[in-house]
């Protein structure tokens, strides 16, 4: 029999095992201890514990003997409790169940001091977190150092569970990577405690749950457990360490958690992670030590957990800061590129007051599919973009506000970044080709006006805010760019960003050119813009290529929504690749810009430790081979399909075939001279270009003629405007407001303007009557002035004309003035 005696009261009744189990499940005041000391009578806080008759024999046996009849005297360390009755009851239950089926050996370590901020500051050096820690060890009390794990006093070894400060240094260096930090923590804990497995849980304070970490990937699995669920929940809710010798007998043990790691637990120790602010960070569970976890392990974990908790807290804080930065970057990505750029009022009014122009104003060949639009100069891009909407009739049909359209064009041009290829000049070239296609009879019959308007707007904005990188670069996990975070789940990262920028522009009050449309039509146009901008992704085109071929072979059906969608995607892709369907000189210069952009991305990837593709590596890329392969697989089939649908665009198919032959000839010229291809300078060699034409001419004279066709002056991606002879310019009656004016308009120099005025004065002297009817004011015309004032002829002109007619006298009847209506009526009345 086990006898328990108090100093001033008789022995109390022993609680039943059922009561023990209930108290354990409630967790209110259950304080077990498995630490064993040497035999002898010991006073424990006012209570003396005696053993049975066999106590003397069992003094040298290990603690936790399975025999229920063998007991020994047990000495417990002083407990920090004010309620002695609760402590005595818990000790009774522990001793009563020793060696029975309810003996699961749990130790809720209440004898470990409360983790307070002052205590943690004593343990951690008072230095900034970024400063190197120099203190080699953490001091411990002598009472804690003298810790025994053996019951035999002669075999006892004094251990010092000291934690080197270098471990904390190592943890702090990994606070920028939570997964690597936890991996290092677990490795250190397993090495010092000889545990076989582990589990890590982090505290979700918002949802009051514990989130499970994955052992292999060291990432959050998403599996969550409520506070109080299982041993982990018990440790988290009480913030106490639990050392369990036999988990099969523990009422809190739950196999569901261990099944996540395929662990067959025998014993474990679970300890909370509490930071310097006494906040719960998480729980770490170590499994399956050979002889169970000892008191020495608990002392080590007590000190070790302080370092772990603060390191993980700093890592979580760093992760939260990084998430905030990512959100800020996302907001910046949603901002319109060039939004901070100031659009001058004078620039807006220049476009608003600019008269309607015919396409011949820019060049006689401006409406030719083979004409390189960049040759008109960047100072004409805005004016030509306005002309596209006017020429197709969209301004009148949809009542587009000219000021808002002007602001939209200026804002779109500011939204393109100064990258080598995907810049504002590329957008203008794509829009020019789309305009040529939309004004053909085939497309007018095949697509509706709203679809054509959507295509024109989409071409103008299709690469806005392009970064000069590819989709694959944006989606690389090493980069973690904000664009990939926003759009990686849907694919076509850059194209979706371009569409988002376009919609933000159209929703601005200053750019809302579609404000007069009904809501249904506006949604239709927006959806069409989205689909065709996404179609500029080459991978998306390759997925639709077979469907387009089937549509052409079966015959285009304008009533089919799918056929109209495929046709718009084809027009958009052809417009995006239209630079390769011009003359070879233009194609070469554009290819140089493309590879400058590719090489810049390749250099960036090398800096990030990523091996770039061969065509993006400036040391290994061979441009002719890449271009030949691209034209053969993508470029030539696209324009062959377009020529099948749009007969007026057959010249584009012939041009890209001729350019393909020229690239083959260029490959033959430079292949034997590797040193010449180290840079892109050979793409500008005029002598090499002439030799290429000679090679192609021997093979196909027609292809050589098409490839060598030049429109002078040609400035690919240049800013020099086209300088045509102003006086010899003809509009053939299309530009009604500028028939008499000059082709240069406001962009002509003052010398040219004076030359025009002097010529007009000379002409006015030869015919005074014509001069009166066609007065020139500042290079303008009477038609322009009459349009500004109204459709009526100014009274001063009629007055001057009457004076001239009345003063005229001639003997020739044919030259005499005709009688007025009043004179005719008076003569008839007199008769």
Swiss-Prot record:
GO biological process: cAMP-mediated signaling; cGMP catabolic process; cGMP-mediated signaling; chemosensory behavior; chemotaxis; determination of adult lifespan; negative regulation of cGMP-mediated signaling; phototransduction
Compositional bias (Polar residues): 7-26, 56-68
GO cellular component: a single term: nucleus
Cofactor remark: Binds 2 divalent metal cations per subunit. Site 1 may preferentially bind zinc ions, while site 2 has a preference for magnesium and/or manganese ions.
CDD domains: HDc (cd00077)
Domain (GAF): residue spans on this chain: 177-312
UniProt region (Disordered), positions on chain: 1-40, 55-84, 762-831
Gene3D superfamilies reported for this sequence: 3'5'-cyclic nucleotide phosphodiesterase, catalytic domain (1.10.1300.10), 3.30.450.40
Function per UniProt: May negatively regulate the activity of cGMP-dependent protein kinase egl-4 which in turn controls body size.
Protein's name in the database: Probable 3',5'-cyclic phosphodiesterase pde-2
Protein encoded by which gene: pde-2
